[in-house]
Amino acid sequence: MDFSSLPYRPCAGIMLANRDGRVFVGQRLDAADSQYPDAWQMPQGGIDKGEDAEAAALRELREETGIVTDLVKIIGRSNEEYLYDLPDELLGKIWKGKYRGQRQNWFLMRFTGQDDNINIQTEHPEFKNWKWTDPQGLPDIIVPFKRDLYRAVLKEFLPLI
């Protein structure tokens, strides 16, 4: 199959910064079954049909971290949509084989709550662990195929953190 003709999945990503300028990352539950068992990522997820990117970002943040809307302030939105392609070994295996990668709208949000407001044991958990990390180290701890995208998001948001 020619995967290059597949569309990109619309997605919202969240760079969640705390008061100390550190960024939330989660370790996916399925990471142990992948070739990247130590990889982390920022919250992200698909934009539903008819949903705008900001609403999707807030929904995904709640679904993945338990953080409710009143505990975050949106500081910025990416000036462009960022794309990434899935590596060959994942093409046709995730998202029911309908997409070649993701087209992401990113949001920088300030977390105004306390760490105990974070609960990754949600109805449909995606993360097994979470931590606050130095934003400049993000590209080093994520899956290789998203590193360029994370570098671009960092370049845009780092001055605002």
Report residues per predicted region.
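NUDIX/MutT-family hydrolases
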Residues: 103-113, 117-149
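Active-site-adjacent beta-strand/loop module that shapes the phosphate/pyrophosphate-binding cleft
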Residues: 78-117, 131
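Acidic, metal-coordinating catalytic segment for phosphate/diphosphate chemistry
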Residues: 1-15, 19-20, 28, 96-97
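Short, hydrophobic/aromatic-rich beta-strand segments within well-structured domains
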Residues: 13-15, 24-26, 105-109
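A generic structural micro-feature
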Residues: 6-8, 36-39, 97-103, 124
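Conserved Nudix-box catalytic region and its N-terminal flanking loop in Nudix hydrolases
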Residues: 19-70, 75-77
